[in-house]
Curated annotation (Swiss-Prot):
Catalytic activity field: (S)-4-amino-5-oxopentanoate = 5-aminolevulinate
Primary location: cytoplasm
EC number: 5.4.3.8
Protein name listed in UniProt: Glutamate-1-semialdehyde 2,1-aminomutase
Origin organism lineage: Bacteria, Pseudomonadati, Pseudomonadota, Gammaproteobacteria, Lysobacterales
Length: 444
């Protein structure tokens, strides 16, 4: 593929934008090469500035669950724009959004809109500390909760991609208030709570890790966290920025039957536009200003255009059997990819929850951050580029989940699998040639 226009833009971008991108993973540092620049998106496709089309399994990192540029979402945005872009004052759409989330996610009696997933998690932690009078928080290796200082300790997503255990600029004293546990380790959680449970304000967790690829909880693990938090009066926060309205209509908490105290949401509730929210029980949320003393604010929170886009999308995903079809499509994709890898003699495992999936280049199921980082990332990188050359775009990191949308029809899935069969065979052939070149010379 010729990416001359993308190359020119990337060179130009690096003169004004740090690293040439506005979020690190986009730079392709993990997989090598240079990013393509997008001109437009429609349905299951992205189109770059050089005229290439890609089947997209990134979906703007999750929110494009009905595909890109869906007519109903686009029309809702056009109507909203005709009435103004931003008010800095309350609007009816904010109320409708809060009521919709509360109806679909019963743990959220009340909801506060913010502008991003990071804002949502930062606000939830402040609320937890203010409401409990405690300072320590617990997170898990490989989980990513945005770029707030408290969270950049063994974080997932871009932190994991760049191999950074933390970030310069995070005060050591603040880091001491963040305790990191191994996800899916029952005994480690129990031991920590027995040692210092009464000093912990909150446990924040991705109920399905989506920022160290796609790692579901072991049976009973989320309930174990719920039991410990209840016993020690610790708030349990589910970061559903990725899983909310993605793995099930009611999110991961509905799928696994575990009720958190607070939930954070991301851009899926804005139809892909910049937005976030956090919610919980009424007694807890009443601590937020102006109802209570814990301050949180935002000029653009509840933006009318974002609310309109989000409401249109939330209406679409309530269609009968929406999630059944989404899950079936993702399962067909994962099964086909695993079969294609196996036929080429390549070890690969897939993991899938609803419309969210992960590709691990290993022959083992992955249940922890350590297992995820032990996978063959070089082989993933080769697969990524082989698929990109064939017009299929997966996340440019071995540590990011993939996403499917309702626009990914059976024909789209089959086109992806056809590309994958060719890609895996190419990788297998390259490996065979390399193996032969490294074999010791046979003496006559």
């Amino acid at each position: 593929m010729n990416h001359s226009r993308s190359h020119t833009l990337f060179v130009q971008a690096q003169t004004r934008i740090p690293g040439g991108v506005n979020s690190p993973v986009r730079a392709f540092r993990s997989v090598g090469g240079e990013p393509f620049f997008v001109a437009r998106a429609d349905g299951p496709y992205l189109f770059d500035v050089d005229g290439h089309r890609y089947i997209d399994y990134v979906g703007s990192w999750g929110p494009m669950i009905v595909g890109h540029n869906h007519p109903a979402v686009r029309e809702a945005v056009q109507v909203a724009i005709s009435n103004g872009l931003s008010y800095g004052a309350p609007c009816a759409a904010e109320v409708t959004m809060a009521e919709t989330i509360a109806r679909l996610v019963p743990s959220c009696d009340m909801v506060r809109m913010v502008n991003s997933g990071t804002e949502a998690t930062l606000s939830a932690i402040r609320l937890a500390r203010g409401a409990t009078g405690r300072n320590h928080i617990v997170k898990f290796e490989g989980c990513y909760h945005g770029h707030g200082d408290s969270f950049l300790v063994k974080g997932g997503s871009g932190m994991l991609t760049l191999g950074m255990p933390s970030s310069p600029g995070v005060p050591a004293e603040l880091s001491k208030l963040t305790i990191t546990l191994t996800y899916n380790d029952f005994d480690a959680a129990t031991a920590l709570f027995e040692e210092m449970g009464h000093h912990i304000a909150a446990v924040i967790v991705e109920p399905v890790i989506g920022n160290a690829n796609c790692i579901p909880p072991r049976p009973g693990y989320l309930q174990h966290l719920r039991t410990l938090c209840t016993q020690y009066a610790v708030l349990l926060i589910f970061d559903e920025v990725m899983t909310g309205f993605r793995v099930a209509l009611g999110g991961a908490q509905a799928l696994y039957g575990v009720t958190p105290d607070l939930t954070t949401f991301g851009k899926i509730i804005g139809g892909g536009m910049p937005v976030g929210a956090y919610g919980g029980c009424r007694d807890l949320m009443q601590h937020i200003a102006p109802a209570g003393p814990i301050y949180q604010a935002g000029t653009l929170s509840g933006n009318p255009v974002a609310m309109a886009a989000g409401l249109a999308m939330l209406e679409l995903i309530q269609a009968p059997d929406f999630y059944t079809h989404l899950s079936n499509a993702a399962a067909a994709l994962c099964t086909g990819l695993q079969q294609a890898a196996s036929q080429a003699g390549i070890a690969m495992t897939t993991q899938q929850i609803g419309g969210m999936f992960g590709l691990f280049f290993t022959d083992q199921q992955v249940e922890t951050y350590a297992q995820a980082t032990a996978c063959n990332t070089d082989r993933f990188n080769r697969f990524f580029h082989a698929m990109l050359q064939r017009g299929v775009f997966f996340a440019p990191s071995a540590y990011e989940a993939g996403f499917i949308s309702s626009a990914h029809s059976p024909d789209i899935i089959e086109a992806t699998l056809e590309a994958a069969r060719a890609a895996f065979q190419t990788i297998a052939n390259e490996a065979a040639i390399l193996s032969e070149s490294e074999a010791p010379l046979k003496m006559p």
